[in-house]
Amino acid sequence: MAAAAVSSAKRSLRGELKQRLRAMSAEERLRQSRVLSQKVIAHSEYQKSKRISIFLSMQDEIETEEIIKDIFQRGKICFIPRYRFQSNHMDMVRIESPEEISLLPKTSWNIPQPGEGDVREEALSTGGLDLIFMPGLGFDKHGNRLGRGKGYYDAYLKRCLQHQEVKPYTLALAFKEQICLQVPVNENDMKVDEVLYEDSSTA
């Protein structure tokens, strides 16, 4: 598929997925989030990972709060995204407790993240990551992912490959409504290792 056609197909699919997500009730979003939290906690890749990056969820994403609490209860090391909005650059920076999240300033997307002047341990500078939880608008069962069009995670995964010998395991968290038959992709789009949703089988 030509680049312009891929871009057009992505735009169209993003619109459709946003409609699907808007149609979900808060109760259904919470129900599926709880199911996925339990799947994550039982997942072999999660259990063996020590250094984990996880996104702080927006309203139309799987709620990650319970997973974050479990990361700390198990003594794992937790990193969250710090986006630079003037570019597609993103770092994963360390937080020390779940309670810290409520004290962070919020971005224009209403996501808490440490400010630019807040000096923190950055994952790729101190040993890399074992596991990255991936957000997204849509996914297919082959691991193709449709993001929001900014390219933050694709660029970050490429940096991971330059900084660490073993690629981090990538685990996408999705509502059933976000699973597509086929996600249009180009050569810059990075596949995820596994898409986790209510009806998926887990490792």
Swiss-Prot record:
Cell compartment(s), UniProt: Cytoplasm
Protein residues bound to ATP: K10, R11, S12, L13, R14, R145, L146, G147, R148, G149, K150, G151, Y152, Y153
Chain sites annotated for binding Mg(2+): D154, D189
In-chain residues carrying the UniProt-annotated modification N-acetylalanine: A2
GO MF entries: 5-formyltetrahydrofolate cyclo-ligase activity; ATP binding; folic acid binding; metal ion binding
Gene Ontology biological-process annotations: folic acid catabolic process; folic acid metabolic process; folic acid-containing compound biosynthetic process; formate metabolic process; glutamate metabolic process; tetrahydrofolate interconversion; tetrahydrofolate metabolic process
EC category: ligase
EC id: 6.3.3.2
Positions contributing to substrate binding: L56, E61, R148, G149, K150, G151, Y152
InterPro entries: FTHF_cligase, FTHF_cligase-like_sf, NagB/RpiA_transferase-like
Functional description taken from the UniProt entry: Contributes to tetrahydrofolate metabolism. Helps regulate carbon flow through the folate-dependent one-carbon metabolic network that supplies carbon for the biosynthesis of purines, thymidine and amino acids. Catalyzes the irreversible conversion of 5-formyltetrahydrofolate (5-FTHF) to yield 5,10-methenyltetrahydrofolate.
Protein name: 5-formyltetrahydrofolate cyclo-ligase
